[in-house]
Structure formats: structure tokens, C-alpha cells
A protein has these predicted regions:
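Pyridoxal 5′-phosphate
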Residues: 1-386
Length: 386
């Protein structure tokens, strides 16, 4: 089965390209184009009253669709922002900066978190414990040891590590070791929409952060976070959306917050991407496209891709260079580690000249897979690497 008919607008712009970087910027399906225009039309109709439509109709619909996708029992606990950093920093701003802050994380987190935490470490009262991702085979054991060695105020870990594609131990397997007073944030950006994910058993205990840019296929500008129900946390970094329902009432000296996920909301943003995300999720629902089906399709593509790699017998790009050769516990991109960053850059440029788009970081070359690929597409690698 091919899904290419759903991505014609993007594919027609790149007829001679094999786009192997959907893990960076995923092609948008055709349904998102009408959604983009729908936001414009709603703005024209509603003008200043469009917020009533967005908060009263559009946003609740997307909350319900996300709750279905992630098996979350409380749709109202999803909050939206333009980027994950904004949501992450709202959680961090709940901690008193005058008090010590102890953070547990890995050394494989994306820049939104890793850069911010390095900056926080410049404070004398912030301590960060980083568990090395490698060797990946023992990460789960070492992570659990770190959890048991001391208590933390904040724990942050990816669902899938961005620089390898390796699936991290699911939070449900180690949450029992975490005290109730510790806040837990899971970065689901490389898991949401790619790996079957159920938040049902952890929804009231963790923050789950993800966005539409990658496997949710709706582009930049719409990130979201599930917030534990009943949390009393009060983000210092807050905006007028965080108590939207009470804006017309007299403002009190004491800052009030919504009693659902919106307590972590910010302020005015462009909701065009929310419309696109709704279109994608509605398309999946109507066509019966589940994340499990997407994952199975991509796993088969990865096997087909590796079969071509084996045929090539390339001196650098081969199965031995795979960072981890385990498709069962892997995200939707494969990572090859070469001897040097210079060789990676040169190989990426050669592939690009041959019509194969990849991306790379240092010594690691990444190939991503998507619904708009067919197994036959990977034959292009032979020409690109000849």
C-alpha cells in the first residue's frame, strides 16, 4: 500500500528527491493546505471574536484527538504553545529560584532542554546529574541506579533520543522509584505519532511534551503538553491564556490559574498550526490510520532500506556503522556513525547531489522514514552512491 497520494503538494515540488529527513522536517499531507486557509477564513469572519471559536471549538477538538491518539483519559489536560521550550520553561519556572534545584537527565537530550539546563547550572544552587546514553544496552540499569542514589526535584528524559533514534526506557517502568514530590517531564517529540504510546497509567503523574513538526506532520508552531490532573504548580512564566475563562472578572492581587492543562498556557500565538494538526489527526481517524500501523509501515521501510545498504557494500555506509542495529527498539530514523565528522559531511553532500536528502550531526548521519516513502524509492541510493 502506498500513501503518496496524500502528499502530492510536497512531492510535486521535489520530484527528483528522496526525502530521508522527515525526522527533522516532515512533509505535510495535502489536508493541511485547506486547514491553513481555514484559519485565515475564520480570522476574517471572527476578527477579534475568533478567540471564542478557537478556544470554544477548535482547541477542544484537538485536545480530544490527542487524547485518543495517546490514550490519555483527560483531554482538557493538554495545553498548547508555539514551541516545546516555552512549555518546558513553564515547568522549570514553578521552582523557587532561591532554593536548590536538583535535576536528573541524560546526556542525549535535545537543545531546547540541554542548552537551557546548562544556563541554569550557572546558578550556584542548581545541580544537574546526567546519565550517559552510551552504552545504550546498559542505560536502563544506570538510569535506575541514578534514581535510587539521591532525590531530585525534576527529572527530564526523552521517549526516543534525538541523536540516535534509540528508544529510552518507558517512564512507566521506572516511575515507581520516583517520589511524588518530584516533577517528571518526558520529551515525546521523536515518539509521538511514531511509536504507539499510552499515557493512560501515567497521565496524572507526568508532563508529556511533543509537537507537530515531525511525525505529527503539521509543521512548526504547534507544540503541546499533557499536564498532571489536579497539579497545584504555579508557573511564574505565565500569560493571559492561563486563566482565559476569568479574564472578564476583576483581577485579584493573587494570580489565579485554570484548573486544567491551560494553567501552563502562555499568551497570544498564531493558531494556524493547530488547524493543520487537527486536519492531520482527523484524516488519520477517518482513514483508520493508527500510530501502530504507521510504525509497522516504517519498520518495513527500514528493513527494505537496510537490504539496499547491504547490496551496496559501501565502505562507510554499511550495517556495521549503524549506531544500534535493533529495529524493534528504535524510532523512525536510523543513525550511522562514521569515523569522522568530515567524512559524514562529505557523504551527506554526495547523497544530496544524487537526490537523497539526509541530515547529520558531528560523526552521525541520520536517515528518516515516512508514509510518503515506498520500498522502491531506496533504489535511488545506488545511483547516489555510485
Amino acid at each position: 500500500m502506498s500513501y503518496k497520494q496524500h502528499y502530492q503538494h510536497f512531492l510535486k515540488q521535489h520530484p527528483e528527491t528522496l526525502h530521508c529527513s522527515p525526522h527533522s522536517h516532515h512533509y505535510w499531507p495535502d489536508v493541511t493546505r485547506a486547514a491553513q486557509l481555514a484559519y485565515w477564513d475564520d480570522s476574517a469572519k471572527g476578527v477579534d471574536h475568533k478567540w471564542d471559536m478557537i478556544f470554544g471549538e477548535r482547541l477542544p477538538r484537538v485536545q480530544k484527538l490527542l487524547a485518543e491518539l495517546l490514550d490519555h483519559p483527560a483531554p482538557e489536560q493538554f495545553v498548547f504553545a508555539s514551541n516545546t521550550h516555552e512549555l518546558l520553561y513553564r515547568v522549570i519556572s514553578c521552582f523557587d529560584p532561591a532554593q536548590p534545584l536538583r535535576i536528573l537527565t541524560s546526556d542525549g537530550e535535545f537543545h531546547s532542554f540541554s542548552r537551557q539546563v546548562r544556563r541554569l547550572e550557572e546558578r550556584a544552587n542548581v545541580e544537574v546529574v546526567r546519565v550517559s546514553c552510551e552504552p545504550y544496552a546498559t542505560f536502563a540499569e544506570r538510569w535506575q541506579q541514578a534514581l535510587q542514589q539521591q532525590s531530585f526535584d525534576l527529572i527530564f528524559c526523552s521517549q526516543v533520543f534525538f541523536n540516535s533514534g534509540v528508544v529510552a526506557p518507558w517512564v512507566g517502568t521506572w516511575l515507581a522509584w520516583v517520589p511524588e514530590s518530584t516533577q517528571v517531564v518526558i520529551d515525546g517529540y521523536h515518539g509521538c505519532g511514531a511509536l504507539p504510546t499510552s499515557l493512560h497509567d501515567v497521565a496524572d503523574r507526568i508532563f508529556y511534551v511533543a509537537g507537530a513538526y515531525k511525525y505529527m506532520q503539521a509543521g512548526e508552531g504547534c507544540c503541546f503538553m499533557s499536564v498532571p490532573k489536579g497539579t497545584a504548580l504555579r508557573p511564574e512564566y505565565t500569560g493571559w491564556f492561563a486563566d482565559f475563562a476569568n479574564l472578564a472578572k476583576p483581577q485579584q492581587t493573587h494570580v489565579e490559574y485554570a484548573n486544567d492543562g491551560m494553567r501552563f498556557a502562555g499568551a497570544t500565538m498564531d493558531f494556524t498550526a493547530l488547524y493543520r494538526l487537527e486536519a492531520v489527526l482527523q484524516w488519520w481517524r477517518e482513514d483508520g490510520i493508527t500510530v501502530a500501523a504507521i510504525h509497522q509501515y516504517v519498520q518495513q521501510l527500514q528493513s527494505d532500506f537496510l537490504a539496499v545498504i547491504d547490496e551496496l557494500e559501501h565502505p562507510l555506509l554499511n550495517r556495521a556503522a549503524l549506531l544500534v542495529d535493533d529495529l524493534a527498539e528504535h524510532g523512525h530514523f536510523l543513525t550511522f556513525e562514521l569515523p569522522s565528522a568530515a567524512e559524514v559531511a562529505a557523504l551527506a553532500k554526495q547523497l544530496q547531489r544524487g537526490g537523497v536528502e539526509t541530515d547529520y550531526r558531528g560523526k552521525r548521519l541520520r536517515f528518516g522514514f515516512a508514509l510518503y516513502h515506498d520500498a522502491s524509492d531506496y533504489q535511488r541510493l545506488k545511483k547516489a552512491l555510485s
